[in-house]
Design a protein with these regions (language model features):
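Cytochrome P450 catalytic core segment centered on helix I
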Residues: 138, 177, 186-240
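Conserved cytochrome P450 K-helix E-x-x-R motif and the immediately C-terminal K′/meander segment
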Residues: 280-315
């Protein structure tokens, strides 16, 4: 057994390889496996010129996510940033300069999370009218989008990304937030720009926060039965600016996790052999989506954690304030969890980390899963689908954090008689956490 060194390893002195490469875009599992073979459950990597620790092991990722007394999220803990060693134009920096519940610690985080959970509760409660009204609206919007890309024809080509998987969560956001004027696709594209990093990231963050803050101010004068109004009503009260930041965080989750969970679920079916397809579609849609949460989670690498003190993790001793990236995708591929793609790993398993774990587990996971299962269910009930490109030619985003397609071309044929797929749950109750905490 190898023991961590007594002194912390200095990231700057380690020879680290870039994480985001062509291999990572097309075959991320092989990159994680190579890093695991070389370093064990924790590996030093270069993230656009800044060295960070990538956590690969299932047990180690779960430990980091669960223990907020050791692992902090507020960027003020980042030693390299405090010391001025992070370039001002580092592509991911804009996303860390906005304070919301995803990037807060301790009591400040608890206050934000309590407010968001209270406001979200009726939209995730199976007995509340708001939940089934939203679920019915999502189903109706899914049918509208299918009718729109089919345009009255029996068959044709569609981009399921732009014409369905991005559009449906956006329609849900418009309804959930109570936007007086429906937001367009540019809202989700700004989320992409922020998450993927680059020269437009800071401006994208500014536009998103401005839109949600303006909405909060509008709803203060024009309340409705929506999430924004409910956030304005929580006690102790939040400022309009705070509400704008929390709504911004929810938009990011909806655009990144929900839209790509839809396309990844459809791809899981279409890329399989005929027997695999039949097996996947024979069970409830929830089982298919749960399988995809394990085999192809949309949010592959989470936002930074920072050890509050020098800490042993894997085969290294990490220095206080080092940047640490918990990798959901790598954890799900850990041989200690299960063999990637195996039946044991993916069917009927609830022990996944796709929605996180611990104090920062996604508070809207029930709502998100409702949208995904409804979307996938309606697609397969109404259409026969085939891939428009070979699997190895599908265009993946170049992103540290997200595994999703830039576009998803398919050939569809409308069904003359709908073939029922096991229906998703009527409402979006969060239920038990996928990963017990």
């Amino acid at each position: 057994m190898q023991f961590p060194p007594s002194e912390p390893s200095e990231l700057a002195s380690l020879a680290v390889e870039p994480l985001v490469t062509r291999d990572f875009e097309t075959r991320p599992a092989t990159v994680y496996a190579r890093l695991r073979a070389r370093y064990g459950p924790v590996a030093p990597v270069d993230l656009h010129g800044v060295p960070v620790w990538l956590v690969l092991g299932f047990g180690e990722v779960r430990e980091v996510l669960r223990d907020e007394s050791v692992w902090k999220k507020d960027v003020q803990h980042w030693r390299w940033l405090r010391e001025g060693r992070v370039p001002a134009d580092w592509p991911h920096l804009p996303g860390y300069q906005v304070s919301h519940l995803l990037l807060q610690d301790d009591q400040r985080h608890k206050a934000s999370r309590d407010a968001v959970e209270e406001a979200l509760a009726p939209f995730q409660d199976a007995d509340a009218p708001q939940s089934w009204e939203l679920a019915n609206a999502v189903s109706r919007h899914a049918d509208e989008l299918i009718a729109f890309f089919a345009d009255g024809g029996d068959s044709g080509w569609a981009d399921l990304g732009a014409q369905f998987a991005r559009a449906l969560p956006l329609m849900a956001v418009n309804r959930l937030f109570g936007f007086p004027v429906e937001q367009g696709d540019d809202v989700f594209m700004d989320s992409w720009r922020m998450v993927d990093g680059g020269p437009d990231a800071a401006a994208a963050v500014g536009r998103l926060v401005a839109a949600t803050t303006e909405l909060a101010a509008y709803k203060r004068q024009n309340p409705g039965d929506d999430l924004t109004t409910r956030l304005l009503a929580v006690e102790p009260p939040l400022t309009v600016e705070q509400i704008g930041l929390e709504l911004y965080a929810i938009i990011v989750i909806m655009s990144e996790l929900v839209s790509h969970a839809i396309t990844n679920s459809v791809l899981e079916v279409l890329a399989g052999e005929a027997g695999t397809r039949d097996g996947l579609m024979a069970g409830p849609v929830e089982e298919l989506v749960n399988r995809v949460h394990i085999a192809s989670p949309p949010w592959v690498n989470l936002t930074f954690r920072f050890p509050a003190a020098d800490t042993d993790l894997g085969d290294f001793r990490l220095a206080a304030g080092d940047a640490v990236v918990p990798s959901i995708a790598a954890a799900h591929g850990d041989p200690m969890f299960a063999t990637p793609g195996s039946q044991e790993a993916s069917v009927s398993s609830r022990a996944h980390l796709a929605w996180g774990a611990g104090p920062h587990q996604c508070p809207g996971r029930g709502l998100a899963d409702m949208i995904v299962t409804t979307a996938v269910g309606r697609l397969f009930e109404r259409c026969d689908l085939e891939l428009g490109l070979p699997v190895d030619q599908l265009p993946w985003r170049s992103s540290t954090h997200v595994r999703g397609l830039k576009s998803f071309p398919v050939r569809y044929r409308m069904r003359t008689r709908q073939v029922p797929v096991a229906a998703p749950a009527e409402a979006a109750a969060p239920g038990p956490a996928p990963e017990p905490v």
